[in-house]
């Protein structure tokens, strides 16, 4: 593997915003897709996360492809749905963007933990990240299912060996967190500005 498993993500981040600083739909979704192979390396522990992320990318992408000019900018989905009064629906693009962003919050926090806590086991790093990000938005059933799955997290050393490739994995993880985190912050900021950042799982 040329570079690390993060190399495509780091490259994709350069194209996510327009020259005016607006979040572009297609590059953002493509960036999220580059993270799916990273999730694959976790095996069964991340099956739920991968399925959730993949489903939300597909939902947003389908709507984007219905009118690429109209939905060139990521937040247009939300603005259109708010006007149509469907933004709070469980199958809305607004809901999809919110949960996609939250799942990515979890992954960023997980990789922050792996960088900052060299002595933590993988299940410990996963559990801490879940507590800090997704847990408060999940109901009891989702929380129990998620916590059970995270116990299947792979051995940390084996995982690091698999994702390292020929690059500097510590440096790439740090860059991933530092550069991807602000995009997620922007999403939350926008969603909060229209009252859509605090929806819980049903």
From Swiss-Prot:
UniProt-listed InterPro entries: GLTP_sf, Glycolipid_transfer_prot_dom
Protein's UniProt keywords contain Chloroplast: no
A Gene Ontology cellular-component term: cytoplasm
Keywords per UniProt: Lipid transport, Transport
Binding site for a ganglioside GM3 (d18:1(4E)): 52, 56, 99, 138
Coiled coil feature spans: none
Domain of life of the source: Eukaryota
GO molecular function per UniProt: lipid transfer activity
Family: Belongs to the GLTP family.
Job of this protein: May be involved in glycolipids transfer.
Name of the molecule in the record: Glycolipid transfer protein 1
Source species of the chain: Arabidopsis thaliana (Mouse-ear cress)
């Amino acid at each position: 593997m040329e570079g690390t498993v993060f190399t495509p993500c780091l490259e994709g981040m350069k194209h996510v915003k327009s020259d005016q600083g607006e979040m572009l739909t297609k590059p953002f979704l493509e960036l999220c897709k580059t993270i799916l192979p990273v999730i694959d390396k976790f095996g069964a522990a991340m099956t739920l996360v991968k399925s959730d992320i993949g489903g939300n990318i597909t939902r947003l992408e389908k709507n984007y492809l219905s009118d690429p000019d109209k939905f060139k900018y990521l937040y247009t989905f939300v603005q259109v749905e708010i006007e149509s009064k469907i933004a709070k629906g469980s199958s809305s693009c607004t809901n999809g963007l919110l949960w996609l962003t939250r799942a990515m919050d979890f992954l960023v926090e997980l990789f922050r933990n792996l960088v900052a806590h060299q002595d933590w086991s993988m299940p410990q790093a996963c559990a801490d990240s879940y507590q800090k990000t997704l847990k408060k938005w999940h109901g009891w059933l989702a929380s129990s299912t998620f916590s059970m799955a995270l116990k299947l997290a792979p051995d940390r050393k084996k995982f690091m060996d698999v994702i390292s490739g020929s690059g500097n994995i510590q440096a790439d993880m740090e860059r991933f967190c530092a550069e991807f985190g602000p995009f997620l912050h922007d999403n939350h900021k926008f969603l909060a500005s229209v009252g859509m950042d605090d929806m819980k799982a049903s």
